[in-house]
Amino acid sequence: MIEIIMLLCYNVFMISPRRDILIRRIDRMNITYIYHSSFLVETDSCYYLFDYFRKQLPKLNTEKPIFVFASHFHQDHYNKKVFELLKQQGMKNIHAILSKDISKRNYPETDGIEITRVTFHQHYELPCGTELQTLHSTDSGVAFLLTCPEGTIYHAGDLNDWMWKGEPEQENRQMTGSYRHEIQLLAGKTIDVAFLPLDPRQEEYYAEGMRYFLEKVDVKTVYPMHYWGEPEIIDRFLSEYPEYRHIVKQTETWQ
């Protein structure tokens, strides 16, 4: 795990005594990047953990509830081992929010975990004053839009404009249309923090999904994800689209 924490509060940078932790204050949420597409968001009342795949989790406050979100069944977005890790830490109140495409045989095997199965284009009321809206992924499962007392959080999962070199033009056009339809559902909302795919495997199409999102959605801060160990793709995006430097940040350094 790259243990980097962002405290959303006053738009100020702080460096902790540990050299590998950089803290950015913007509002009232602490955000830790875990790995790939996984992030931990801490508020005053609870934790939200998105798309855990692998790597170590930070030390958690066992008195707080934790909501574990899994956007779909792909192995780089869901690993039921996360529930064992949480139990090992002594977490007492664990609530899993799992996309319906995740097989029940891959549900947590430990007792005392509440499970909510979710599907696309639905609204759900969660504890801690949290509202959840789901979008339809262009790949598998859902994307998550959370509204909590501390702000609004968007985690795309695999909702992206998955255009690929060599694919039939018609399929790429259909993909773009499907993606844009979903993003337009966010029109009129203000999102405080968004976690969006920026995948170098798409080659010349790598920026299409993020660029459209930034054009259409009122978002304050974006952290790219799903870049398969190549954070240099963020530098490329910011070089090609410098107008978004004040929004799109370096995920592994928060710069």
Question: What positions do the PLM features span?
Answer:
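A short, acidic, amphipathic alpha-helical segment used as a generic capping/interface helix at domain edges
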Residues: 178-185, 203-212
